[in-house]
């Protein structure tokens, strides 16, 4: 199964989370595999050229792991009256009252259509090759549409959709660490010369 519906449909006042299970598995394999590969590469370059050159793979690994982490963080969260689409860079928080429907787009990716015709793309269901055979975007759309039908009637007082920057602490720490390490290492290399 390529999606997880965590904690059911709002069971015990907990939100339902729609995401691809495969992304978590791929992330784990990629981070561990890249980590082992990068460690071996750093050791090899260090043994041939010294640590002055060998360390440079470490920030590259941290930035790549952070970017992969942002992708894996993508999901759709269904709360009582709010749908939240968490994409790699932007998070869309949309009240139930302004959502018309959810459906797979022409490219196979999931889209949430708001009143007024605006659509919010869902990166977590971005129309992958597997989607065309497994129909995971369609299944996620059905779950969202069922959530829309089972909710309370909108009272008309809901505000519009809000968009904010996505926060993903582990990924952000990895990217920031990579950038700081690269900057610090470049400064160290410049100061020590040679």
Task: Please give the residue ranges for each predicted region.
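Conserved beta-hairpin
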Residues: 61-101
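Acidic, Ser/Thr-rich low-complexity segments on the non-lumenal side of membrane proteins
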Residues: 92-125
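Hydrophobic alpha-helical transmembrane segments
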Residues: 27, 49-61
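Alpha-helix capping and helix-coil boundary motifs
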Residues: 48-54, 129, 136
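N-terminal membrane-targeting/pre-transmembrane regions
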Residues: 1-48, 149-194
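A broad, low-specificity signal for short, low-complexity segments enriched in glycine/proline
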Residues: 35-48, 60-64, 69-74
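A membrane-cytosol interface segment of integral membrane proteins
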Residues: 114-172
